[in-house]
Amino acid sequence: MTSLDDSVLTKKNIALLDNATNYIRPAIDYFHFKFNYDSLDVSTTWRLLLKMRKHKLLRLPSCSSENEFDYSIYMARLYHCIWRRWSIKHFNLDEYKIDPLSINWNKEIDVTVLYGPDLVGIHEREQPTPTDFPMGNIKEQGKQLLDVRKEGSASSLLKKGSVFYSKGKWLSQRSISFDDTVRRRDIDKRGRFRESCVLINDVEQFQNYSIVWDESRHRYRRQALPDTYDYEHLYPNGDETPRNTPHDNIIIHQNLHSITEGSYIYIK
């Protein structure tokens, strides 16, 4: 039974899959390769060549499947070559063969070899040996991870034998800091834009800081306010709703009730 379905695990399908995926498998010379006639290697190769010559599924060593004419001619040559070798072996015609160079038809410029895919057996692919991997380092790292799991802390990773300690230097990570404010630019329909500063972190109950522009870092940052700062100017009526006063300076004093998460601080 033959099938083109790659899910059917037959000897022919495995040979076709190995031909398409195993790039380290060498090609063979169909003129001189020693086929095993007892194990039906020739008949198996012949049937595969006959079946696959219309589907262009085989990967040929010196022919591209994109050129349909060259591919069909190459497959026909392989097919007829293997058929002639089987006929010579089956009818015992070895002694009747003639040397092609002895015939006067300008044979010296003809091809004396014909390479094709090896469809006889499945060659084992090269697998990396266990010596290629640093097993000692893997075992040490696994032991350190087990120590951390047992102790419940990362104290074992801070030793000099740890993977984070290399050549007398600690492999420390660079600290990451996040700003509490981000800049935003709004553009209206007429093309006018206005830059604003958006507060993204207002967890504290009362904001004892101001937002200032840092020239060295080229971004806004928070600056702590003195303890004697008077917030009464924000509540002239005694209620909790602050008045809407323009901010003429770059230093903006704000209260938690006047800025909520996602609100804007407009700066002229």
From Swiss-Prot:
InterPro entries: Glucose_repression_reg. GO terms for cellular component: cytoplasm; nucleus; vacuole. One of its GO terms (biological process) is cellular response to glucose starvation. To yeast YKR075c. Present with 2010 molecules/cell in log phase SD medium. This is Uncharacterized protein YOR062C.
